[in-house]
Amino acid sequence: MGSYALPRSGVRRSIRVLLLALVVGVLGTATALIAPPGAHAAESTLGAAAAQSGRYFGTAIASGRLSDSTYTSIAGREFNMVTAENEMKIDATEPQRGQFNFSSADRVYNWAVQNGKQVRGHTLAWHSQQPGWMQSLSGSALRQAMIDHINGVMAHYKGKIVQWDVVNEAFADGSSGARRDSNLQRSGNDWIEVAFRTARAADPSAKLCYNDYNVENWTWAKTQAMYNMVRDFKQRGVPIDCVGFQSHFNSGSPYNSNFRTTLQNFAALGVDVAITELDIQGAPASTYANVTNDCLAVSRCLGITVWGVRDSDSWRSEQTPLLFNNDGSKKAAYTAVLDALNGGDSSEPPADGGQIKGVGSGRCLDVPDASTSDGTQLQLWDCHSGTNQQWAATDAGELRVYGDKCLDAAGTSNGSKVQIYSCWGGDNQKWRLNSDGSVVGVQSGLCLDAVGNGTANGTLIQLYTCSNGSNQRWTRT
């Protein structure tokens, strides 16, 4: 993970306690639906619950926060695996060539071991967070420096680290499927293979992982490029044991239900998989539960690491992406994850799905052609029993279709299209369902509107200033 591990385009089930409901009549009163409580937890902490299936649930630890008693209390109680957030990276462990400094890394390692936790090593070879002396090298000199660094760090921790992220973030973003243009890549295309072979010789007992971000969606070129590399390595006997999926989910790289397929396909190559740096903008409980269940569904998924303890500890704290609030209190996402780990599938959408019918048209809110593609604009269509007209209200204020797609506003101005998009917890996917029949976007303050007061099949849906017109009033059927 690095300071740029998210795309620059921007950043996009909990316990079923209170589900927002749409009005039953035009001027009816909205009814709150109370769902049965979830299954009782067999274990009361994340690590213990994960251990029931032979997995771990870990967190990233920063040495500078180990004097914070709230931080260490939560981390000590909840997690059974630790990753040093920055302390084992290249600039921290070898600030001068050949002069290793493990003081901060050892502080994290020792705290973990003293508190009964295992440790993941992160990371040995990476284009980022290189000390100045390494940045100035190239070619064979850089290659030798990489080898020496791997040997030096792994010798210090030999037999102590259960998994190492040997290589981090070597593939380019976008649709090219190419390697990232870095100083390490320019030292020769075999640099990743050399790093893994060096690491195996340095510590045969550690699992050796490749780690990257934006590789969770099976259809993406970057994912396919990583898959092809791992397949090639396995075919040729290059010692790779596991693949880490960072899972920094956001609007530019949202959670997709095919993540489970991705994990399964990599596991089928004969490697373990792990979710290594999980954080999700807005911490939607349903998405956290889905990710947890994806890991649980794949026998070779070793476990999950969240990238920080509280929101205030996160590298993206303004996006509130973790399981604990700034004050250390648990979020709904925490409960959803714990329930999933304890065997209760919290990822199922609320069981209150139904049609949303326009008062003026008598037609239903419809996803054209039952499309599941993000960005598909909604329309009016004759009501029927298809899943593309079944909308479930969640306690987070979402309106979901197909379980993992949300009613989504593409903008905040009049005329902005209303579409489906993978649920990610943003305010543009949250709606107020009012007793007058209006459906108002939380982010925009505008109403769900049938374009041009239209009533015919195919009339598109947009946002527009609320007017109490019949094209802006809806009932639940």
From Swiss-Prot:
Keywords tagged on the record: Carbohydrate metabolism, Disulfide bond, Glycosidase, Hydrolase, Lectin, Polysaccharide degradation, Secreted, Signal, Xylan degradation
Pathway(s) the chain acts in: Glycan degradation; xylan degradation
Gene3D superfamilies according to UniProt: 2.80.10.50, Glycosidases
Active site residues according to the UniProt entry: E169 (proton donor), E277 (nucleophile)
Primary enzyme class: hydrolase
GO biological process: xylan catabolic process
Signal peptide (from-to): 1-41
Record flagged with keyword Disulfide bond: yes
CDD domains in UniProt: beta-trefoil_Ricin_XLN-like
Subcellular location: Secreted
Disulphide-bonded residues: C364-C383, C406-C423, C447-C466
A GO molecular-function descriptor: endo-1,4-beta-xylanase activity
Record field: catalytic activity: Endohydrolysis of (1->4)-beta-D-xylosidic linkages in xylans
Cross-referenced PROSITE patterns: GH10_1, GH10_2, RICIN_B_LECTIN
Signal listed as a keyword: yes
Residue stretches making up the Ricin B-type lectin domain: 361-477
Domain GH10, residue spans: 42-340
EC number, UniProt record: 3.2.1.8
Family membership noted in the UniProt record: Belongs to the glycosyl hydrolase 10 (cellulase F) family.
Protein name (database record): Endo-1,4-beta-xylanase A
Source organism: Streptomyces lividans
Taxonomic classification: Bacteria, Bacillati, Actinomycetota, Actinomycetes, Kitasatosporales
